């Protein structure tokens, strides 16, 4: 868990009865338990607006050539695992790889990771693409049009770009070291690969590339996952429950207030 060993000395060893701890999913909970195993931690996941109900300009993805488009978004840093995604793409059989398009979006905070992506783009210029930055309306349009989201993070409490994909009914392939992995039902609303292993990610990618119609059929299940865990209403319900447990106040009185 990135960072926790370095801040453990700043985290209280005990909590008073009026202090409750909430975490954004199972991965963040496990991270805290790695340094404070006795803490009782509740789940409280953020809520995102329903971007699918908004209007925004269409972002041009013609470079994908009508092929399934696999997208990852985030600053280039070791924690985000762009190198794992690069290696997985290289491991695909040529006849499989050429049936898809891959887009990396993010600023190059780590030069070695940017070099890995640049090399991949150079080797497969008709298949792999890079954009340093997209504006918010472009991201929304991209999520609406892409086929699948890929999150290869080595440590990621709850990646928001994966959630944004769910808003538009898009399945994801995520590392087990993400908060999203704790909510996905395998093969129903997404896929999880283990051990930060590019070969295991490549296996999921190959299946997804060969079965775009099955990914499309996951749309409603992905949308349901968003509404159940990530919608603004789900967040409001979770926050009210957390406050009720802390104060002993009834849910009815919270709603009235």
Which ranges hold each PLM region?
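Short hydrophobic beta-strand element within catalytic cores of glycosyltransferases
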Residues: 171-174
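Conserved acidic donor-binding segment of nucleotide-sugar-dependent glycosyltransferases
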Residues: 186-187, 191-198, 207-212
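Short alpha-helical donor nucleotide-sugar binding micro-motif in glycosyltransferases
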Residues: 133, 141-146
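Aromatic "clamp/platform" in nucleotide-sugar-dependent glycosyltransferases that forms part
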Residues: 154
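Membrane-proximal helix-turn-helix segments that form the acceptor-binding/catalytic region
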Residues: 1-21
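A short, well-ordered alpha-helix in the C-terminal region of glycosyltransferases
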Residues: 200, 207, 214-229, 235
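Conserved donor-binding/catalytic core segment of Leloir-type glycosyltransferases
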Residues: 22, 62-80, 86-89, 103
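Short, structured helix-loop element that forms part of the nucleotide-activated donor/catalytic region
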Residues: 28-33, 101-126, 138
């Amino acid at each position: 868990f990135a960072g926790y060993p370095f801040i453990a000395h700043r985290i209280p060893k005990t909590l008073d009865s009026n202090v409750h701890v909430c975490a954004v999913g199972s991965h963040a909970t496990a991270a805290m338990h790695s340094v404070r195993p006795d803490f009782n931690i509740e789940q409280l996941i953020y809520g995102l607006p329903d971007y699918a109900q908004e209007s925004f300009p269409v972002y041009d993805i013609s470079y994908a050539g009508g092929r399934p488009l696999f997208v990852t978004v985030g600053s280039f840093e070791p924690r985000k695992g762009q190198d794992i995604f690069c290696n997985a793409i290289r491991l695909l059989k040529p006849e499989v790889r050429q049936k898809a398009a891959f887009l990396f979006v993010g600023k190059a905070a780590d030069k070695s990771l940017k070099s890995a992506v640049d090399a991949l783009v150079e080797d497969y210029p008709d298949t792999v693409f890079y954009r340093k930055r997209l504006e918010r309306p472009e991201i929304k349009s991209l999520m609406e049009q892409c086929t699948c989201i890929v999150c290869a993070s080595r440590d990621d409490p709850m990646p928001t770009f994966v959630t944004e994909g769910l808003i538009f009914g898009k399945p994801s392939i995520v590392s087990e070291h993400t908060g999203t992995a704790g909510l996905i039902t395998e093969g129903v609303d997404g896929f999880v690969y283990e051990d930060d292993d590019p070969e295991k990610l490549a296996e999921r990618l190959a299946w997804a590339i060969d079965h775009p119609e099955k990914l499309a059929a996951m749309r409603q299940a992905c949308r349901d996952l968003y509404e159940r865990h990530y919608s603004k209403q789900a967040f409001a319900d979770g926050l009210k429950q957390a406050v009720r447990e802390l104060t002993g106040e009834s849910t009815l009185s919270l709603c009235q207030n």
